[in-house]
Amino acid sequence: MDCISIDELHHRIKRLRPDDLILDVRTLEEFLAGHIHGAQNTPHEEVVSIADTLRRYETVYVHCKMGGRAKMAAQELEGTGLSNVVCVGDGGIERWIEMGWVLKK
């Protein structure tokens, strides 16, 4: 599984293509409080149920609050046979907020 930092995701944001997806695996309440623009929310406990729909994306960037849930979700998705998953760790949305980067509410 490929892993990148949230800083690297921030760097890549401007180059994301329509066939890339940012998957926020926090709870709906956390997501609604603030999320990365364009991100889709599916709580980490439910990601396996959307695995088939994720196959159409070139890259699926999985992130959460700090990185723990993202790692679990990415591993579960890889267990379904997906090879397009990138785990985003090293701070997650907490680091995003700390850096003052824009969130959508």
Task: Pin down the residues of each PLM region.
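Rhodanese-like catalytic fold shared by cysteine-dependent sulfurtransferases
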Residues: 1-21, 27-59, 68-105
